[in-house]
Amino acid sequence: MRSKIWNNLIAGLTALVLAATLSPAASANPDDETTNNPVSCTANKAMEQKTLGKFHAYVINVDTGEVLVDVRGTELTPSASVIKTLTAVAALQKIPADYRATTQVLTVPNEPSTLVIKGGGDFTLTRLVAGESSVYSKPPRIRTLARDTLKQLSPELPITKIILDDSFFRGETWNPDWPRKYRTLGYVSHITALQSDGDRIQPNRLISSYSFRRGKDPVQKVGEVFREFLGERATGAELVVGQTPSDAVVVAQVQSQGMRENWLGHMLTFSDNTAAEFIGRHAAKAAGLEPSIAGTNRVIKSTLRELGLRPKALVIRDASGLSDQNRVHSKLLAELMVKVAKAENGLEVLTNWMPISGQTGTLRYRFQGKSAIARGHVIAKTGYIPGLYGLSGIVNAADGSRLAFAVFARADQETGVSVTYTAQGAIDKVVARFYVCGASLTQ
């Protein structure tokens, strides 16, 4: 009897062990936020968050080329600042590696009391002096221009007129798509080839009155500051906007930091809109196009075509992403990030400049809570305009795979769906799932 009971007990335990081994319940929920199941792993639950509004996503396994997620991947959406990745790519392909923007002072032979200050498209030129700090690294100074100019002039010669030449750029200085309040909010300045400190009202970041607010006339402001630094000899000098006479002679000049090593990194890390617009115009000029809004838009699309992408459907209205009329799709952005990850055409340098999750730039304070698992593993460009949040970049996933992605959370007027700042955290949850799932990500 005891033998029979013992045999039955062993048989029962064996059945339990086999059931535990074979049952699907032995695996964690593949869409659970805490799982890292290598067999089947999705971000579906995260992508269904209501705070994402109308959601777009496209994810590609960099090494295999497999498309892992496609949610409205080819449907057009406003871009916000994610478009700065396209601007950076155009700059990398068109602008010489050692290029620097130059601001010059010239004299006019038949008008000895006239000076010209000629802008070369340098928004980092600063009116600040020693002991004051710009948001830009090692900027050229207007004071240096004034000092070097005075050294070249006869000490008895008065300065009665200063010509302000901002003709290096063409066309409108304010994009008609931008709300006027973007200037007073400090989002962007007028895009003039002659300006200082991105035309911030108070550019010294070391004092409490530091302000991102931008001025109304950046060209005039440079003239006023230059005249002041020239001292008593120029006190009554007339400021006139005009072009440089053909016989003018350069007597002083200053140059920006290298555009590639300095400007592009600043633009992508801190999402500087003024920087993006200047860089876009320089890229257009380098490509033989007009350095204007239209030229910028053309150089971005033509560069993408040259890289083997298909930008025909895209609508590019500016270089910064402030226009709500820009239209991109997540598929092309993800395909571009594949090229970045694979170091094609020198694009790998973008990974040195794009923000890193939880560490740098506009992602420094992102990826909180459960999403913190992906901190340090996502390199991506953020985007925001009213009604839309975006993120596009590369995930270095937990399993060692690399995923190129682009996601957008947007409002939808047709259905009445809206999005708020909470969409940022929701996007972080989605991308954290990409990190957890890696090559096993499915939809």
Per-segment meaning from a language model:
Residues 65, 79-97, 194, 225-229, ...:
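Active-site SXXK
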Residues 93-110, 238-242, 347-351:
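Short, well-structured active-site flanking segments
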Residues 2-12:
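Bacterial N-terminal signal peptides that target proteins for export
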Residues 12-21:
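Bacterial N-terminal signal peptides
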Residues 68-70, 284-443:
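Small-residue-rich helix-loop
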Residues 2, 20, 24-78, 97-98, ...:
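Beta-lactamase-like hydrolase cores
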Residues 29, 54-56, 111-192, 199, ...:
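Mid-domain, small-residue-enriched loop/turn segments at the edges of structured enzyme/sensor domains
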Residues 199-349:
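A small/polar active-site loop signature that marks catalytic segments
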